Curated annotation (Swiss-Prot):
One of its GO terms (biological process) is D-glucose transmembrane transport. To yeast STD1/MSN3. Residues 48-64 have a biased composition (Low complexity). Residues 77-87 have a biased composition (Basic and acidic residues). Residues 1-117 are annotated as: Disordered. This is Protein MTH1. InterPro entries: Std1/Mth1 (IPR035189). Residues 9-47 have a biased composition (Polar residues).
Length: 433
């Protein structure tokens, strides 16, 4: 009966890792395998088969010696070694860390392969895995820590150009209902059409409103950079911070002290009143959306932008109305002056015109006065004297042309109505008292 040798399977490898009682049992196992008749297989097969027990015996004896010489380290030494290795990894550069991790990982792989047949391979692999079990995880953690720790070493941006300071996209500043309602109402820059107004210096101050940001960019650090413009005649620009989670007082103060329409020289009281009204309206709308009354509004980006644009529109309309009012008042004064200086026929003053009974009414005093005037001005006749007197009177009247309160109130109301109608606003002009 032919008996074949057991195949070298994983089961056989597991059996090799089981502890052996003594060296004699190894020889017994080898002798039992050698008892197979030689005539049942060829010579080459027999030679290779006889060499198998010898290699297994030598491998098992080597493993036994390694087991006797191996000493398990106490847990505190293991933890201390692990901490020391981590410290060295953190102190090394990223390239050295990756090279060190790969070399240690390959070394651990070679060690596990060399000791695959040993009885203590499981213990050794578990000891190695406790330190280098997840090199990718350690590398990821080191990368994150190094990126955070190395960022302050980079030079922070303290000066930016106007193009770099302005936002590149605007889709998060407006609700989807506005952006998706009618594509024809969207400008080429992605903003709605109502952000473009035919008002005095609107484009300039719209750019200034876009420089109000809700958060700092990472490359700015903890401070707002300076906006650089080219040219001496360029207007002033600066970045302002207004977080989404801000109190009403912070929002009002930021709007009032902004650079919006600084050239119009609007009075502080008007800007403060306009900012308070804008924030109060936004609070009512926020409470209607959220259904709760918050001490500090946690605004969304569209709500936040809506507050800025409403305040900008209020002061822009006021600046436009005041500009139109000054022009209308100047034009009205010129018209009144022209009406008062209409050309009249060249006639002497009424006191000089002789009456019908001049011979009876003229006194000697009047005759003497007229004679003295003619004697003092022998080269000028009476008509020239009358024209000089009329010119002096007109010059005095020109300096005294003014408008009454009723006239100013009427002109102001007309300017407001024209601006509101031109912009399509349903606002009501101030009533004339």
């Amino acid at each position: 009966m032919f008996v074949s040798p057991p195949p070298a399977t994983s089961k056989n490898q597991v059996l090799q890792r089981r502890p052996l009682e003594s060296t004699n049992s190894n020889h017994g196992f080898a002798s039992s395998l050698q008892a197979i008749p030689e005539n049942t297989m060829s010579g080459s097969d027999n030679a290779s088969f006889q060499s198998l027990p010898l290699s297994m015996s030598s491998s098992q004896s080597t493993t036994s010696s390694r087991r006797e010489n191996f000493v398990n380290a106490p847990p505190e030494y293991t933890d201390r070694a692990r901490d020391e290795i981590k410290k060295r990894l953190l102190a090394s550069s990223p390239s050295r860390r990756s090279h060190h991790s790969s070399s240690m990982h390959s070394a651990s792989r070679r060690s596990s392969v060399a000791e695959s047949g040993s009885l203590l391979s499981d213990n050794a692999s578990s000891y190695q895995s406790s330190i280098f079990s997840a090199p990718s995880t350690v590398h990821t953690q080191l990368t994150n820590d190094s990126s955070f720790s190395e960022f302050p070493n980079h030079k922070l941006i303290t000066r930016v150009s106007l193009d770099e300071a302005l936002p590149k996209t605007f889709y998060d500043m407006y609700s989807p209902d506005i952006l998706l309602a009618d594509p024809s109402n969207i400008l080429c820059n992605g903003r709605p059409k109502f952000t473009k107004r035919e008002l005095l210096d609107w484009d300039l101050n719209d750019i200034r409103s876009l420089l109000i940001v809700e958060k700092l960019r990472p490359e700015w650090g903890n401070q707002l950079p300076e906006v650089i413009t080219v040219g001496d005649n360029m207007p002033q620009f600066r970045l302002q911070l207004l977080p989404l989670y801000s109190s009403d007082e912070t929002i009002i103060a930021t709007l009032v002290h902004s650079d919006l329409y600084m050239e119009a020289n609007l009075d502080y009281e008007f800007k403060l009143t306009s900012a308070k009204y804008t924030v109060a309206t936004a609070r009512k709308r926020h409470e209607h959306i959220t259904g709760r009354n918050e001490a500090v509004m946690n605004l969304s980006k569209p709500e936040w932008r809506n507050i800025i644009e409403n305040y900008l529109l209020n002061i822009a309309v006021e600046a436009q109305c005041r500009f139109d009012f000054k022009q209308r008042c100047s034009e009205y004064k010129k018209w009144k002056l022209q009406q008062s200086n209409l050309k009249r026929p060249d006639m002497p003053p009424p006191s000089i015109i002789p009456r019908k009974n001049s011979t009876e009414t003229k006194s000697l005093l009047k005759k003497a006065l007229l004679k003295n005037i003619q004697l003092k001005n022998p080269n000028n006749n009476l008509d020239e004297l009358m024209m000089r007197s009329s010119a002096a009177t007109n010059q005095q009247g020109k300096n005294k042309v003014s408008l009454s309160k009723e006239e100013k109130a009427t002109i102001w109301s007309q300017c407001q109505a024209q601006v509101y109608q031109r912009l399509g606003l349903d606002w009501q002009p101030d009533s004339v008292s």
